[in-house]
Amino acid sequence: MDDRRPLLRLAKKNREISGIWKTIWPDWLSRVAKGASMSQSERAEFEPIPPFQGDVRYILLLTLVATLGGLLFGYDTAVIAGAIDYMVEKFSLSATMKGWVTSNILLGCAAGAILAGPLSDLLGRRRLLLITAVLFAVSAIGTAIPANLTQFVFFRILGGLAVGAAALVAPIYVAEIAPAHLRGRLVSLQQIAIISGMVVVAVVNWFIALQGDHTWNVHWGWRWMFGSETLPAILFLFCLGLVPESPRWLIKQGRTDEALKVLNRTSGSARAAWEIADIQRTIAEETGRIDELLRPGYRKILIIAIILAILQQVTGINAIIYYTPTIFRSSGSTDIMALAWTILTQAVNLTFTLVAIAVVDRLGRRPLLLLTSVAMAVSLTLLGWAFHAKMSSTWVGIFVQCYLASFAIGMGPVVWVVLAEIFPTRTRG
């Protein structure tokens, strides 16, 4: 008797294939028929991605110009560290007023960050960065020559507006000007630029303090410290006049021809049209609403994000950054040595931020946050004990550097990475 089981299995397989083909065939025909009527942005989803042929040096130049905003962010926030003790003597500030003069910039930062999003959509990324450059320059001049403390506070808050806006808009501009395969590395330059600004201003403050004795610094030195920011602010303003607007913003405004000119240079002519179609499709799919974050599925993520952001700011980093010279003067250092310690502290901050960028993907976000949080707690405890036991400034310096290194490799940069990753794409903005 013949074994017909192989033939039966083959017949069954043919019926299955036939059934699948009957299901696919009408859909495929409709796609082909629709192809002629597809928009450019719809075709982009199915077409192969053309090769990248952009000018990398030009992209890097645009990135460096934008990240000057980050450098000014770091410069403007950290300049107070070298000046505040001289201002205490100049204006006879109480401890409460010293804290207010040091921290009032944060009011401007908050307002600037809130306003920057809507304003950058309305005016454009480049135009808003131009405004921040002007604010940085005006703030630098105003804080250098105030007639009284009220004027100083006003111009300091004005600088805070620029800091908050630059913190948001500069990385957005870089993200929108850079091709996808370079975007992550180029956006990470913003964090490096911020800390580089802190290093630069620490060196500038130290150099200015060397130009005279203590009395000269009380009357004039701190003014030059604030006024020195005018130079990088004017450089930022000049360079922004040479860069184009973000192609994404241009496309959103219907100025596709202008966007094409930019993309021809940043992505290459072969890829520019595909980039425009892809951006148009992405803009059309941006349907996320802020109230979605309050839904049960997102609520836990939102709470975690808020707690992480708060913890990042209340772990003592701002006290260390703003009062580094004060900390070392309190431990027995001279004015000049306290400012020299500040340079070392910011250099450690920059070095370990670079380490964090190198290891965050290999070691993972959670282990880095947990381990460095423990290290920060231990370092702060030892720092407090050093003052209690009246240890030398060398021990104080060691514990401060340990704290900064722990923050710079963990809580500082990694929190921003986590916040960028935990939200679904549709609600991320």
Q: Residues of each region from the PLM?
A:
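Short, well-structured alpha-helical segments
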Residues: A272-R281
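Catalytic cores and adjacent flexible loops of soluble metabolic enzymes
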Residues: K13
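Alpha-helical transmembrane bundle of multi-pass membrane proteins
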Residues: V32, S39-N264, R281-G429
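Leucine-biased recognition of intrinsically disordered, low-complexity hydrophobic segments
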Residues: L7-L10, L29
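Tryptophan (W) side chains
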Residues: W21, W25-W28
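Short helix/loop segments within enzyme catalytic domains
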Residues: T266-G268
